[in-house]
Amino acid sequence: ENHIAAIESDRGGFAPRGFTCDGSEANLEWLKSQAQLFEDYDLHVFEKGYGGVDIGPLKKEYPEIALFGFVPDSQRYFDMHHSPNDVFENVNKRELELGAAAVASFLYLLDQQFK
């Protein structure tokens, strides 16, 4: 089994803003090269960063793995996170759909890159 990439979404279900990469310089350059495809949708964060706490341990088993993190808008994160407001009924359906579309598009591009 060979793991080459992983993605995590664990920063809330808010409007998408981009993706971060914990990987090689080549992985980071690839990520940055994808930014133009997302510009029209107001995604602008394509930078070196943290993949996520849940996928982080994969680096021990697969040192070359590229870890990507989905970055949503963070303005209201602590209005919800671990508060009484942190229930599914309070999730903005449109923002969740936009995030799902961004991640699906990103995964398609990732698949094309690592074929």
What name fits each language-model region?
Residues 77-115:
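His/Asp/Glu-rich mid-to-C-terminal helical/loop segments that flank catalytic regions of hydrolases
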Residues 1-80:
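Metal-dependent peptidase/peptidase-like ectodomains
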